Amino acid sequence: MIKELMHDPIFLAGKSEVATKEDLQFAQDLLDTLMAHRESCVGMAANMIGVRKRIIAFLDESGRAPTYTVMLNPEIIKKDGAYDTEEGCLSLLGGPRKCKRYKTIKVQYQTLEMQTRTKNFTGWTAQIIQHEVDHCNGILI
């Protein structure tokens, strides 16, 4: 179900809780909402739809064809190649803001089947994931 986007900076600055299998409907809602905003958005975290759970959804361009991916409880366990960039966010008013990102990251997460996976990401997809994991950690750009 498509949800309304959250714009309250106090709510967005709160850390998200661990997601469980009972939270899978939130994951679907997040994906539905991201796809509804696909013209202007490439990633979302659950707190952006008012749910403080560690769930992210994003456009994954790391494979042969772009696909939407959902991760539960993502943790960046390794990062390399720091660079400065600017990013925008649908949750925040105003234009792009400066931030630091990494060219390559290794992420440990759970799938929708609650299986733990570890995967490396680079480039644009890595940047999107870092932005959404920041949301889970209560960090706003």
Could you describe each region identified by the protein language model?
Residues M1-I141:
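Positively charged
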